[in-house]
Amino acid sequence: GRVLSVFHNRRWDSDFLTLKGLLAEGVLGEVAYFESHFDSFRPQVRDRWREQGGPGSGIWYDLAPHLLDQAITLFGLPVSMTVDLAQLRPGAQSTDYFHAILSYPQRRVILHGTMLAAAESARYIVHGSRGSYVKYGLDPQEERLKNGERLPQEDWGYDMRDGVLTRVEGEERVEETLLTVPGNYPAYYAAIRDALNGDGENPVPASQAIQVMELIELGIESAKHRATLCLA
């Protein structure tokens, strides 16, 4: 048989792996609030297809799939979704701002992206019944690949920006720096190898990618009608 898989590489980001480990260990307790950002500062509209208004252009199609995939990997599908999409830069022809609220029975997930953020935004803000986690900075793997670096390298995936973990112990709040575990994009390819050899599961089956696509389309409808839409 054939294996169809989708490269949702952001599941192997350093900060996401760190956060996933925290949740698996129950360090934060029950998560009530999860906020995830992909922000940048690019005030000038560039002459490239992603910004020219054609099919699939704009950051809702470009960046939101990563954030949506991470959210449903952690929490599953939401009950409903409310999305605001906009073109905020002068001359913008495609979406350069999004703000999505994914509603769960006891949780709210905020996914945000903009191209007009000169100040640094937190990558993650997570609040739970036992503590909080806040992380700044982006996983370094994409930038290193763009710079022509090749594997293997001993320091691959190391993120020099650590997060802050705040625990609640009785009446006290204890704040500590939390080391960010290394990112690991190569793990996706190792998992694909194992899946092809019949030695492991498909790391990102098509069914999971379809869920993300459905949320992308539902978000567009939500923004169009300025309404909260429930998943079927």
Regions found by a protein language model. Give the residues of each.
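Contiguous beta-strand/loop segments that form the cofactor/metal-binding neighborhood of enzyme cores
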Residues: 69-153, 186-202
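Well-ordered beta-strand positions enriched in small/hydrophobic/aromatic, beta-favoring residues
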Residues: 4, 34, 81, 100, ...
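A short glycine-threonine-serine/GTX helix/turn-capping micro-motif
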Residues: 55-61, 174-183
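A general structural signal for well-ordered alpha-helical segments in protein cores
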Residues: 13-16, 67-68, 161, 185-190, ...
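Predominantly a Rossmann-like dinucleotide-binding segment in NAD(P)-dependent oxidoreductases
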Residues: 2-3, 10-91, 226
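Short catalytic-loop micro-motif centered on adjacent basic/acidic residues
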Residues: 4-8, 110-112
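C-terminal helix-rich "cap/oligomerization" subdomain common to oxidoreductases
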Residues: 151, 177-179, 187, 191-232
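Structured beta->alpha junctions
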Residues: 8-11, 38, 115, 208
